Design a protein with these regions (language model features):
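Helix-loop-helix hairpin linking two adjacent transmembrane segments in secondary transporters
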Residues: 110, 139-140, 144-195
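Residue-level signature of mid-helix packing/kink "hotspots" within the transmembrane helices
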Residues: 36, 65-73, 157-158
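Extracellular/periplasmic helix-loop-helix junction of adjacent transmembrane segments
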Residues: 41-70
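Conserved MFS/SLC helix-loop-helix module at the cytosolic interface between two early adjacent transmembrane helices
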Residues: 69-109
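Juxtamembrane intracellular "pre-TM" segments in multi-pass secondary transporters
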Residues: 6-13, 198-228
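Extracytoplasmic
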Residues: 19-51, 242-247
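Cytoplasmic helix-loop-helix junction between adjacent transmembrane helices
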Residues: 114-153
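Extracytoplasmic gate region of multi-pass secondary transporters
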Residues: 224-264
């Protein structure tokens, strides 16, 4: 990054290498946090919101995935057109507000709608955090940076279910969503004041259907890109299927209760 675009938009000293890794990992971890921390509370959510069919409790996770999937496409081109910071902060705002609002859901339908919105907001961090790394680093250095970020990121799926289970000891499932929103707010403020704009004005692209279609055609006609996409789709599909049914299988079928976060 040459340094004129983003750093003038943030206060204080420039972002260090270590802080950039930590912030990028924190942004990406919000996605895993929104899924894993609330898994122990699915049973309570279903009971409190009147879900009669226990299979329908999993819709709380499915709605989140649906929102994220729907928003991944528009956030990418939007960040190429308007820069990285504005779309990312917009998405973070949706994530925080939807998470806190979900804590006050009075019906299962309201919960699903808010989880869909939270997924929409989380899509911004998933797409844009990677783009910000690509803006600042290239080649081997980018690969090393992404490896470090994912090392930090992988801590969240390990500890989040246990944190959620501990919260259920001191409160109910609503406390989990309030905590989720609070953590998102802290990371949003951190990004607002410390994360610079990484996309230079001369590198921005028009946000048109033609440009989006051209980019899609480039990916779909490249054999290597298509194979990587299919492999990633198969892997993530299996992972999301496991996450979507894990709580019901571990708790409902095997009766593991509070042991679920440890075994998960």
């Amino acid at each position: 990054m040459t340094g004129t675009t983003g750093e003038r938009q943030t206060a204080g000293r420039p972002l260090s290498y270590i802080e950039f890794i930590a912030l990028a990992a924190a942004l990406m971890s919000l996605n895993a946090l929104a899924i894993d921390i609330m898994l122990p509370g699915l049973q309570q959510i279903g009971a409190d919101l009147g879900v009669e069919n226990e299979n329908h409790r999993q819709y709380v996770i499915s709605a989140y995935f649906a929102g994220m999937a729907a928003a991944l496409l528009p956030f990418g081109p939007a960040s190429d057109r308007f820069g990285r910071r504005a779309p990312m902060l917009f998405g973070l705002g949706i994530y925080v507000l939807a998470g806190i609002a979900a804590a006050f859901s009075q019906s299962f339908e309201m919960m699903l709608a808010l989880r869909f919105l939270q997924g929409v907001g989380a899509a911004s961090t998933r797409v844009i955090a990677v783009s910000m790394v690509r803006d600042r680093f290239g080649g081997r250095q980018m690969a090393e940076m992404m490896s470090l970020i994912f090392m930090v990121f992988m801590v969240i799926p390990v500890v989040a279910p246990s944190v959620g289970q501990i919260m259920l000891v001191f409160g109910d499932w609503r406390l989990i969503f309030i905590a989720m929103g609070a953590i998102g707010l802290v990371i949003t403020v951190w990004a607002l004041f410390r994360m610079p704009e990484t996309l230079r004005p001369e590198d921005r692209r028009p946000f048109t259907l033609a440009s989006i279609g051209s980019a899609f055609a480039m990916v779909l006609t490249n054999r290597l890109s298509l194979l990587y996409t299919l492999a990633s789709t198969a892997t993530l599909g299996a992972l999301f299927s496991f996450i979507n049914s894990a709580q019901q299988v571990y708790v409902g079928i095997y009766g593991l209760g509070v042991m679920f976060p440890i075994l998960f």
